[in-house]
UniProtKB/Swiss-Prot annotation:
Function: Catalyzes a salvage reaction resulting in the formation of AMP, that is energically less costly than de novo synthesis.
This enzyme's EC code(s): 2.4.2.7
UniProt entry keywords in alphabetical sequence: Cytoplasm, Glycosyltransferase, Purine salvage, Transferase
Gene Ontology MF: a single term: adenine phosphoribosyltransferase activity
Pathway membership, UniProt: Purine metabolism; AMP biosynthesis via salvage pathway; AMP from adenine: step 1/1
Transmembrane segments: none
Cellular location(s): Cytoplasm
Name of this protein: Adenine phosphoribosyltransferase
Alphabetical list of PANTHER family matching this protein: ADENINE PHOSPHORIBOSYLTRANSFERASE (PTHR32315:SF3)
Organism: Mycobacterium avium (strain 104)
Pfam families: Pribosyltran
GO biological process assignments: adenine salvage; AMP salvage; purine ribonucleoside salvage
Entry's family note: Belongs to the purine/pyrimidine phosphoribosyltransferase family.
Name of the gene encoding the protein in the UniProt record: apt
């Protein structure tokens, strides 16, 4: 069966199990809470399988703090690869590789260990739960590339298409399981 044929049931599972939270974390934002999706065994298995197809060929899967860890670890297990946790700033002991990026109001930092893991030449797919503006995923890709890794793609469960995040990642291929 093709990806297109399999995407509809996965997209339906995602839609049925995504909790819409108005005005969170601030007024005017419609937060997409994927917690019920991750807690459902059938849905989590379907999401993991679909993301794993997009990550095939990677020798390491990277997940972004914190919900990206959930799906990245499951995908890495399915692909028999390792998983790399890309952490928010200040969560790892030094030394770290860090990448600062801008948010709507301020900035943030992503970090990975600077020793103990050699990423040079590793083919990495970055996985996260939601693609919004693309700032976090773009920063993660820059961070990994600076270590000598080859970032081959990004894959997300849910894309908020109206926010244009895909453009921030161009020309990196971005795979999504559903879009709103």
């Amino acid at each position: 069966m093709t990806d297109a044929g399999e995407a509809t049931p996965v997209a339906e599972l995602i839609a049925s199990l995504t909790r819409q939270v108005p005005d969170f974390p601030k007024p005017g934002i419609q937060f997409k809470d994927l917690t019920p999706l991750f807690a459902d065994a059938t849905a989590m298995t379907a999401v993991t399988g679909a993301l794993a197809r997009h990550a095939s060929g990677a020798d390491l899967v990277a997940g972004i703090d914190s919900r990206g860890f959930l799906v990245a670890a499951a995908v890495a297990d399915r692909l028999h690869t390792g998983v790399l946790a890309i952490r928010k700033g200040g969560k790892l002991p030094p030394p770290v590789h860090a990448e600062r990026y801008d948010l709507e109001y301020g900035s943030a930092t992503l970090e990975i260990p600077a020793d103990g893991i050699d990423l040079r030449g590793r083919r990495i797919v970055i996985i996260d739960d939601v693609l919004a503006t693309g700032g976090t995923l773009a920063a993660a890709a820059r961070l990994l590339r600076r270590t000598g890794a080859t970032v081959t793609a990004a894959a997300v469960v849910f894309e908020l298409g109206a926010l244009g995040g895909r453009a921030a990642l161009a020309p990196l291929p971005v795979h999504r399981l559903t879009c709103q």
